[in-house]
Swiss-Prot record:
Gene3D superfamilies: Rhodopsin 7-helix transmembrane proteins. Belongs to the G-protein coupled receptor 1 family. Receptor for thromboxane A2 (TXA2), a potent stimulator of platelet aggregation. The activity of this receptor is mediated by a G-protein that activates a phosphatidylinositol-calcium second messenger system. In the kidney, the binding of TXA2 to glomerular TP receptors causes intense vasoconstriction. Activates phospholipase C and adenylyl cyclase. It is found in: Cell membrane. GO terms for molecular function: thromboxane receptor activity. The gene is TBXA2R. It holds the Pfam family 7tm_1. Keywords: Cell membrane, Disulfide bond, G-protein coupled receptor, Glycoprotein, Membrane, Phosphoprotein, Receptor, Transducer, Transmembrane, Transmembrane helix. This is Thromboxane A2 receptor. CDD domains: 7tmA_TXA2_R (cd15143). Residues 1-29, 88-106, 173-193, 271-289 are extracellular. The keyword Transmembrane applies. The modification Phosphoserine is found at residues 329, 331.
Length: 343
């Protein structure tokens, strides 16, 4: 607990920022435009997904369910966090004046962790689903129902929410961050802050790493099967190419947007001497770095829907006409059937 000589809640740290500086940093027009573009992009992706899910194969349908959960998560994340940030930027209200008990700050901290970690976990889940579908087609049910796919999405959401609630249970703290328009985990040296910061950064980093590993194996397997099969043994492969292209795009976007923030959090909480003073102050350079990395991470919510929109078969065929003329292909089942017969 930082001494502040007042009845304010524990989410307030000593700050030294003027109103004029806040006006220069917190532009309501930029924040509003960012949110509008992001919300419109995700709505467009959801409408395209709704049409794509009709008449698709069972395998592709389950993948599209996970993708729908990802886009829905990004949409709700922009909607909830954007409403708070844009309101603060427009009114430039003092957080301690409207939220002395830190209820709004805790709520925003939870949703920031939830909507930050959920896309990373969903990306790893989608990579796992495609990995099993490509390399172990007989080790899972032939048909993954939409109900089961949505149940998996629900479990991912529950795991992300459970992590976000930990500071409310005593592990870590949510505090108002520079320039006073948002709340996030505390980059302090106390054991709870360090543990929560490392837990968040490690889970996010492991999700990205797992996605990279599984996607690499899946792509290598697809390439091996494509070059090793005869045309007579093949069946349509365009959907496999489409799903892997989308999955690789999602992984690349998540890596570029989130890894800098995750690495920065881990480095800051482990820094010796501590980055945060005993009074709760961070250097202005550290606060500005955190804000920059956070803004980079939020681009993930805008770019995710465009990965799906641009990496559809209709677009890929324009970039690579061979996709629309090549023979039917890419099933691992003929090879596996032959191997079973030989054994």
């Amino acid at each position: 607990m930082w001494p502040n000589g007042s009845s304010l809640g524990p989410c307030f740290r000593p700050t030294n920022i003027t109103l004029e500086e806040r006006r220069l940093i917190a532009s309501p027009w930029f924040a509003a435009s960012f949110c509008v573009v992001g919300l419109a992009s995700n709505l467009l992706a959801l409408s395209v997904l709704a049409g794509a899910r009709q008449g698709g194969s069972h395998t592709r349908s389950s993948f599209l369910t996970f993708l729908c959960g990802l886009v829905l998560t990004d949409f709700l994340g922009l909607l909830v966090t954007g409403a708070i940030v844009v309101s603060q930027h427009a009114a430039l209200f003092e957080w301690h004046a409207v939220d002395p008990g830190c209820r709004l700050c805790r709520f925003m901290g939870v949703v920031m962790i939830f909507f930050g970690l959920s896309p990373l976990l969903l990306g790893a889940t989608m990579a796992s689903e495609r990995f099993l579908g490509i390399t172990r087609p007989f080790s899972r049910p032939v048909v993954t129902s939409q109900r089961r796919a949505w149940a998996t999405v629900g479990l991912v959401w529950a795991a992300a929410l459970a992590l976000g609630l930990l500071p409310l249970l005593g592990l870590g703290r949510y505090t108002v961050q520079y320039p006073g328009s948002w709340c996030f985990l505390t980059l302090g040296a106390e054991s709870g802050d360090v543990a929560f910061g490392l837990l968040f950064s490690m889970l996010g980093g492991l999700s990205v790493g797992l996605s990279f590993l599984l996607n690499t194996v899946s792509v290598a397997t697809l390439c091996h099967v494509y070059h090793g099969q005869e045309a007579a043994q093949q069946r349509p492969r365009d959907s496999e190419v489409e799903m892997m292209a989308q999955l690789l795009g999602i992984m690349l976007v998540a890596s570029v947007c989130w890894l800098p923030l995750l690495v920065f959090i881990a480095q800051t909480v482990l820094r010796n001497p501590p980055a945060m003073s005993p009074s709760g102050q961070l250097s202005r350079a550290t606060e500005q770095e955190l804000l920059i990395y956070l803004r980079v991470a939020t681009w993930n919510q805008i770019l995710d829907p465009w990965v799906y929109i641009l990496f559809r078969r209709a677009v890929l065929r324009r970039l690579q006409p061979r996709l629309s003329t090549r023979p039917r292909s890419l099933s691992l089942q003929p090879q596996l059937t032959q191997r079973s017969g030989l054994q």
